Amino acid sequence: MSKGTVALAMSGGVDSSVSAYILKERGYDVIGIYMDLWRDEREEYCNKSAAEDARRVAEKLDIPFHVINIEKKFKDNVIDYFIDEYLSGRTPNPCVACNRTIKFEAFFNAAKEFGADFMATGHYCKIEERNGRKVIVKAEDDKKDQTYMMYNLKQYQLERTIMPCGEYKKDYIREIAENIGLDVYNKKDSQEICFIPDNDHGGFIKRNYKSKVSEGNFVDKKGNIIGKHKGIIYYTIGQRKGLGIALGKPAYVIDINPITNEVVIGDEEDIFRTELIARDVNFIPFDKLEKSMELEAKVRYSAKPSKATIIPLENNKVKVVFQNKQRAITKGQSVVFYDKDMLVGGGIIEEIV
């Protein structure tokens, strides 16, 4: 007897491909869906290749396969946001934006239109029930854990979402793929932003919005001009390489001012801070933070969680006070909170205090 119908987001990669197999083995009826998100002349072949990989896997596993076009929604909510953030002197997190608006909104709604009871992805996270609520827990494979990008999810989404890969190590996922004859078993993991395969975000922005990128001044902490920069989109807090200025000592980006089009340069000690304000905060184990909590938090995907106090503010904001100084806290990035293995929530870094 079927456990229900699952619409699986298939990317053509090994994780979503093996997810299809696992779900079938568990007794679900699986529908494979590839999302056509973005293309230009440089990326079109890559998109076709990924879609064909997904289609071949679906045929091999004998599951229905569909391609849906979400280009406009992706452009409006991810591409435009990505570019606007860089032009505003912030460093965006497109994967967080994509999860919130595309994978767990647009795809979630598409799954319902296909008559699915659940949706599934190849993300490395676990969904459990604790104290009567669905929560997100760190993946079995700590090196592949993707909970940092999931803090925006709501209860209604978690109740209908399955993430099979979260329960396994990545090596085992590849082993399954090879054993069942999937030719994507050795396909490389994507390391870059999906719509910028060459990882040159500055070039991408300049190709699409050339008129908005202009040179400006490097200034020191006192406002003295110390050089010329090629456009604020090319810089982020804590950056040392590629500045193109020689000061006789290591120089770091410590602030970006989009109004004056200036990049502020300082010393390494200037990029270590302990406090920030985050906006658009979402919590998963509860609806609202009523009082301060002692948790762990991290300010980038690759960082280790560090002890911090999370203090509720008005307008869906929080203040985060770390016990130890954090390197290069960056406006536009996400700060994410944990209680041991459980994802508690997160928000967008708005201000560094």
UniProtKB/Swiss-Prot annotation:
Molecular functions (GO terms): ATP binding; tRNA binding; tRNA-uridine 2-sulfurtransferase activity
SUPFAM superfamilies for this protein: Adenine nucleotide alpha hydrolases-like (SSF52402)
Annotated organism of origin: Clostridium botulinum (strain Okra / Type B1)
Protein localization: Cytoplasm
Enzyme Commission (EC) number: 2.8.1.13
Pfam family, one: tRNA_Me_trans_C
Keywords in alphabetical order: ATP-binding, Cytoplasm, Disulfide bond, Nucleotide-binding, RNA-binding, Transferase, tRNA processing, tRNA-binding
Catalyzed reactions: S-sulfanyl-L-cysteinyl-[protein] + uridine(34) in tRNA + AH2 + ATP = 2-thiouridine(34) in tRNA + L-cysteinyl-[protein] + A + AMP + diphosphate + H(+)
Summary of the function given for this chain in its UniProt record: Catalyzes the 2-thiolation of uridine at the wobble position (U34) of tRNA, leading to the formation of s(2)U34.
Binding site for ATP: A9, M10, S11, G12, G13, V14, D15, S16, M35, G122
GO cellular component terms listed in the entry, alphabetical order: cytoplasm
Feature type site, description Interaction with tRNA: H123, Q333
Keyword ATP-binding applies: yes
GO biological process: tRNA wobble position uridine thiolation
EC class of the enzyme, as a word: transferase
Intrachain S-S bonds: C98-C194
Main location: cytoplasm
Protein name as catalogued: tRNA-specific 2-thiouridylase MnmA 1
Region described as Interaction with tRNA: 144-146, 300-301
Sequence intervals crossing the membrane: none
Family: Belongs to the MnmA/TRMU family.
Active site (record annotation): C98, C194
